[in-house]
Amino acid sequence: MLTKIGFGLDPALLRAVIKTESDFRQHAVSHKGAVGLMQLTPATSARLRVNDAYDSIQNIRGGAKQLRHLLTLYQGDLPLALAAYNAGVHRVKGGKVPRIRETRSYVKKVLRYYEAFRSHPKPSSKHEKK
């Protein structure tokens, strides 16, 4: 499923972001009001035209679209794109991950999960088309 809706992103990367953002809980809500698997804020959901951020497909599609945009903006620099996904583009300056403890921890955690998921890929579902 992630391959089909992930805007060309590695499914292991999307799983790593989802694991970090919501621990795979579809109805997760943050203290800042971000919701769903990829923790989209209401403003981000509106900008990405996600009508129901609790819907797994819409949420992943929106989060993947945002992450793809950030990777393009930061010329493929994954740590910077992840920092912007977490803290906002306005906080990622000078080509460096901002000195925000939560953001630095977030980037490290996603990268750690990404490596783990790449090393041990999830077997495809029998319902997923190859």
Located regions from the model:
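Catalytic glycan-binding domains that act on GlcNAc-containing polysaccharides
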Residues: 1-130
